[in-house]
Every structure is written in structure tokens, then in C-alpha cells.
A protein has these predicted regions:
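Patatin-like phospholipase
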Residues: 1-40, 48-138
Length: 138
């Protein structure tokens, strides 16, 4: 019996994460799993789809909504002071337009951690995400 364990760490990097999304799809194609998954920024946003078993979702919604003025651009920048609309990206898209399967995600026995920065200390913290919809603000 082996005590070896293997975790997957997913980097951030905005649209550079599209390469990561393709690798995650490949992992799903070949049924490759890990003992834990850790993601920061885009790695966290894209990595949850591995546990929800939603192959192709990241690439699909980024291609579909990338040119949507409500999703990314000057409109969200003026309204929310963010180049990407957090309401649209984290609420409208995953709940209505390209649904995220939070129930399938919660069934996974693989723990998923989002890396966040403690604004008081500047140090990283690792938050286990048990429900994407319930912990979206992380």
C-alpha cells in the first residue's frame, strides 16, 4: 500500500488560464484525479469545473461571453470599477446562462482550496470551498 498523494495546484493569470482549462478537460477525458486541488485567481475559477465534471465549460463560456459588453470591458469598469463584471461573471453566467453544477461539485470527495490574500497581513490563506454558490464571495 502506498502513502503517496498527489495534489493539483492551478495558477492564476486571467486568460492565460485558458491553457489550464484545456489541460483540465484532458484530465477529465482520461479520468485523471487528484487527492486535492488548489487554485488561485483564474486557477480557482476554472478548477472548480474539474470537480463538477463539466468538461469544456470554461472554454465555452469564455468564448461565448468574452465579447459581451456586460461581461468584460468599459461598461463593467465604469459600473463596478472592475474590467470584468463580478455580478455577471459570478452570478448571471453560472446560475442562468451557462449553469455551474454545484450539486455535482458538492458530491466530489476531492477537497478544493482557493488561495486568498489576507488584506491585514498580506499573507496567503487557503479556504476550502465546499459549495461554490454558497462561498462565491471568497
Amino acid at each position: 500500500m502506498s502513502d503517496e498523494r498527489c495534489a493539483l495546484v492551478l495558477e492564476g493569470g486571467a486568460m492565460r488560464g485558458m491553457y489550464t482549462a484545456g489541460v483540465l478537460d484532458c484530465f477529465m477525458d482520461y479520468d485523471i484525479s487528484f487527492d486535492a486541488v488548489i487554485g488561485v485567481s483564474a486557477g480557482a475559477l476554472f478548477g472548480v469545473n474539474l470537480l463538477s465534471k463539466q468538461r469544456g465549460r470554461v472554454i465555452r463560456y469564455n468564448k461565448r461571453f468574452n465579447s459581451d459588453k456586460n461581461y468584460m470591458g468599459i461598461r463593467p469598469l465604469l459600473r463596478e470599477k472592475n474590467i470584468v463584471s463580478t455580478k455577471y461573471a459570478y452570478d448571471t453566467v453560472p446560475r442562468e446562462l451557462d449553469p455551474f453544477d454545484d450539486e455535482e461539485y458538492k458530491k466530489s470527495d476531492i477537497p478544493f482550496y482557493a488561495v486568498v490574500t489576507n488584506i491585514r497581513t498580506g499573507k496567503p490563506e487557503y479556504v476550502q470551498i465546499k459549495s461554490v454558490f454558497e462561498q462565491m464571495d471568497v
